[in-house]
C-alpha cells in the first residue's frame, strides 16, 4: 500500500526502533512511528482507518478511549480492534498476593475483557461487525513460541543477562517458559471456546 500514509503509535521505544529498522530494510517510506502513552496521546491528523492490536487489554476507561479514537477518524472512517477475551467473564490482572505472578510480571494493570464488553460502549462509535476466533489458534502460537525459546535457550540467556542481570537471567527464562505454557493451556481449554480472540469493526455514529 505505497499510496497510504501510515502512522504507528506504541509506548515502546524498542518497538519503534524495530519498526523503523524493518521499514529501512524493506525500503518502506510511508510509515511514521510515534512513541506515546495512549492515555495522553493526541493528534490533529484524521485517518481513514485505525487498527488497535492488543492495546485495549491494557486500558481501563473504554468510554474515554473510544471517544478519543472517534476524533482521530474521518467521517467515514472505521476502527478495527483485536483483543484477547473470555467468552463471558471480565476480570483485571491485579497483584494482590504471591499467586498473582502473571499480573505482577507480565500484565500489571491489564484486563481480560469479555467478548461482549466493548458492545456496551457505543456512544461515539457503533459496532459494524464482530468476530470470535477460537483460542486454539493462540494455543498453537504459544506452543510455537515455547519451542523456539527452548531451541534458542543459550542465545536468549545472553540477552536476558543484558536485560535482567546475570543473577536473574535464568529466573526470567523460566518465567517466560511458564508464561507460554500457561497461555497454551488457557487458550486451548475446552477446545478454545472460553478464552479466545475477538475482532470488532466500529464506525462513526
Report residues per predicted region.
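Conserved SAM-binding loop
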Residues: 19-20
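A short glycine-rich, Lys/Arg-flanked "PGG" loop and its adjoining helix->strand segment in the class I
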Residues: 63-78
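Substrate-binding/catalytic lobe of Class I Rossmann-like enzymes that use SAM or dcSAM, i.e.
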Residues: 85, 89-197, 203-205
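Conserved SAM-binding loop of SAM-dependent methyltransferases across substrates and taxa
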Residues: 1-3
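Conserved SAM-binding motif I beta-strand of class I
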Residues: 5-11
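A short acidic, Gly/Pro-enriched loop at the edge of an enzyme's catalytic core
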Residues: 39-50
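A short beta-strand submotif of the Rossmann-like class I SAM-dependent methyltransferase core
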Residues: 52-55
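Conserved SAM-binding strand-loop segment of SAM-dependent methyltransferases
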Residues: 25-40
